[in-house]
């Protein structure tokens, strides 16, 4: 049978700790490793049996039959959206794979702006307050060889926008901006059409330069 090797460090931060043992049967969606610090949950992607646990990976001997069914995420019924994101092990699509549950664990509401830093913004008055709080969606996809962000924007526009709304709800941001290169015409047009009735989500066009 095919062996599947799942690395214990699939993201920025520390390696995860295995929570299964050699000989354990696993299914698609079985939790197999949890963070020891900055990190995200890791799940089995196959039905099979844990055959080895090495320092940097878990090896699973995959079953010949691979049902489509998967194990649901184990969260309480009253779990918040942020708790669900953390439990699901969601990470960013960038190279660092930064854990989304950590990134969104912040209050961006305009009334919670923290301590004024004169060394960072010396030109601003000390009583300065933002009228709005923003989430910036980096859809620029600067690396010349990459296309997955733009592909998802085109093919799953509504899902992407729904995810942005979840992020706004979790962080209490009242505005969101898509930053996308104007050369990606199809993706830009899809976003503009999908957002035509949205007052709080806008599109900002970027020039085609690298690095951005």
Q: Residue ranges of each PLM-predicted region?
A:
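Short beta-strand-turn/beta-hairpin segments enriched in glycine/proline and small hydrophobics
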Residues: 1-14, 41-44
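Short, N-terminal intrinsically disordered low-complexity segments that are rich in Pro/Gly
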Residues: 9-19, 150-153
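Short histidine-centered loop motifs in beta-beta connectors
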Residues: 16-25, 29
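Hydrophobic beta-strand signal
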Residues: 27, 33, 51-52
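Short, charged beta-turn/beta-strand-edge "cap" motif at the junction between a beta-strand
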Residues: 31-40
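Iron-sulfur-associated redox domains of electron-transfer enzymes in respiratory
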Residues: 40-47, 52-212
């Amino acid at each position: 049978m095919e062996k599947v090797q799942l690395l214990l460090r699939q993201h920025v931060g520390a390696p995860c700790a295995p929570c299964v043992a050699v000989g354990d049967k696993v299914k698609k969606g079985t939790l197999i490793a949890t963070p020891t610090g900055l990190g995200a949950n890791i799940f089995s992607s196959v039905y099979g049996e844990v055959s080895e646990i090495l320092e940097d990976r878990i090896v699973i001997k995959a079953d010949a039959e691979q049902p489509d069914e998967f194990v649901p995420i184990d969260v309480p019924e009253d779990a918040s959206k942020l708790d669900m994101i953390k439990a699901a092990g969601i990470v960013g699509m960038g190279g660092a794979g930064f854990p989304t549950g950590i990134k969104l664990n912040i209050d961006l509401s305009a009334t919670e702006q923290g301590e004024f830093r004169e060394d960072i913004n010396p030109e601003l008055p000390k009583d300065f307050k933002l009228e709005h709080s923003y989430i910036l969606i980096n859809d620029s996809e600067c690396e010349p060889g990459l296309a997955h962000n733009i592909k998802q924007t085109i093919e799953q526009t509504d899902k992407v926008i729904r995810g942005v709304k979840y992020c706004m709800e979790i962080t209490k941001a009242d505005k969101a901006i898509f930053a996308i290169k104007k050369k990606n015409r199809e993706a830009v047009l899809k976003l503009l059409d999908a957002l035509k009735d949205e007052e709080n989500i806008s599109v900002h066009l970027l020039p085609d330069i690298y690095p951005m």
